[in-house]
Each structure stands twice: as structure tokens, then as C-alpha cells.
Amino acid sequence: NPCCDAATCKLKSGSQCGHGDCCEQCKFSKSGTECRASMSECDPAEHCTGQSSECPADVFHKNGQPCLDNYGYCYNGNCPIMYHQCYDLFGADVYEAEDSCFERNQKGNYYGYCRKENGNKIPCAPEDVKCGRLYCKDNSPGQNNPCKMFYSNEDEHKGMVLPGTKCADGKVCSNRQ
């Protein structure tokens, strides 16, 4: 390390730092230098203070703050919305399904449920139908599936609406409710 004296294991004269995201050429990075990029609208970038070699702690916007033009709410640094979840599962031209598809989550069967207890699929309460299985509308060429869903025996959570997803105005899914 060019900033340190190997014989003494101390910083060389004139050096402010020897490592860190906010250490450049043995000096603290200038105040305002980005040291951690934003990962989403709910996770602002962090910047060096000019007083330390370390990047400040990773902070997120408060859970529940509206994001993506009110399509979602911040949740642990992300803005989970059903459109993105459908895209991640199925790719382009797939969108959140109509509300009628989510009504299937009241059945408590393979096609729709909110959670499992002792291996049994528990139906969603009417107000929680958008917190169970995720339904997507497939508009890709040659497809006409208005209530597309994903099921995996290996990962029972894949294909379910993610925690923190907006399910109604002012409401998000938590514990599949």
C-alpha cells in the first residue's frame, strides 16, 4: 500500500488514509464524491464526507414513502411493484393481471392462496387477494393468457407477491396479508 509505511504499519507522513471507498491517492475523497450508487428510487446514493475514508452507512427512504409515481411504496430500499415482479418471472410484454385474476387467491388451492400452514394452502381474505399468488397478463406475441401464474415445487415463495408490494392505496403486503 503506497499510503502506509510497511516497517511501522502506520500511514506515511502526509497520508490521511490507506484504504476505503472514500480514499483516493492517500487522501480523503472530496466531500460529495459518490461512494455507493443508488440501487433504486428508495435507496439514495451515498457520498463521501471529506472527513473519512469510509463511505457513510447505506440508508434508505422510509418504508411507506410513495415511489414510482405512486405505483408503489418504499420497502427496505426497494420499490416493489407487481409489474416488475411479472417482468422478472416472465420477461417483456407481461404485466400485472386484472383484479379478477387475484380473486382466485380466495380458493386456497394450487392456483391461488395466501400462505401455507402445515403444508395446507390457506385462502386469502377478500381484502388480501393481492398479497398471495402473483397473477400476470401475458401480452407477448402468440400469447393470450390474462391470468398467468408461476409455480415452483423447489421454491414455494417464487411466484408469490413480494412483501412490501402495494396492494391498495395506502396498503402494502406484509406476511401475505
From Swiss-Prot:
Per the record, the major location class is secreted
**Gene Ontology biological-process entries:** proteolysis
Keyword vocabulary terms for this entry: Calcium, Disulfide bond, Glycoprotein, Hemostasis impairing toxin, Hydrolase, Metal-binding, Metalloprotease, Protease, Secreted, Toxin, Zinc
- Disulfide bonds, which pairs? C3-C26, C17-C23, C22-C48, C35-C55, C42-C74, C67-C79, C86-C136, C101-C147, C114-C124, C131-C173
Q: Which GO terms describe its molecular function?
A: metal ion binding; metallopeptidase activity; toxin activity
**Pfam families per the UniProt record, alphabetical:** ADAM_CR, Disintegrin
Name the UniProt record assigns to this protein: Zinc metalloproteinase-disintegrin-like scutiarin
